[in-house]
Amino acid sequence: MKFSPLLDELIQSLRCLPGVGPKSAQRMAFQLLERDRKAGLKLAAALSSAMSDIGHCQSCRTYTEETLCPICASHKRGSSSTICVVETPADVLAIEAGGHFTGRYFVLLGHLSPLDGVGPEELGLALLERHLASGDVAELILATNPTVEGEATAHFIADMARRHKVLISRIAHGVPVGGELEYVDSTTLALSFNGRIPL
């Protein structure tokens, strides 16, 4: 069945979201139109505001509506000498949820991937190097994902940081708390054995 042009446009627009196929997009559109137009208008307004007003922090590159994000603008954390390098703003939220890290961040917005045309420039590494060259950074914690690209990115950044005599560390990888060994892949088990600590 062919829908009206506006309804078809709404369904197609919802399909841009990850994991949303044609049927899911259709259900979402019908839900908003049939049962919750007020929420649909609120969603449209929030989406419009976010798309026009949210940019990147000039210091760490996470999402913010201001020049600096709340962490970088904080007197205590913004002047921290420890920077944690992550791939995405979602990684910042995950680390913040743990409440254990009190330094500042640098968000790469991806990882090195020459085949996809993602090099050091696209990751903002010139800005990171300026932070390192300022002399205000004592430690760089590399928290890129444990993928081939994430590891390559971590090694590239570590080489860059060594030129500035900055302490470099990498977050640990291994068996998750509550995980069962029989379900853990061999690479993760190898990392767990190689990274074991004395008790």
From Swiss-Prot:
The keyword Electron transport does not apply. It holds the Pfam family RecR_C. A zinc finger (C4-type) spans 57-72. One of its GO terms (biological process) is double-strand break repair. Residues 81-176 form the Toprim domain. One of its GO terms (molecular function) is DNA binding. PROSITE patterns: TOPRIM. Keywords: DNA damage, DNA recombination, DNA repair, Metal-binding, Zinc, Zinc-finger. The keyword Zinc applies. Gene3D superfamilies: 3.40.1360.10, 6.10.250.240, RecR Domain 1. SMART domains: TOPRIM. May play a role in DNA repair. It seems to be involved in an RecBC-independent recombinational process of DNA repair. It may act with RecF and RecO. Belongs to the RecR family. This is Recombination protein RecR. It comes from Shewanella oneidensis (strain ATCC 700550 / JCM 31522 / CIP 106686 / LMG 19005 / NCIMB 14063 / MR-1). The gene is recR.
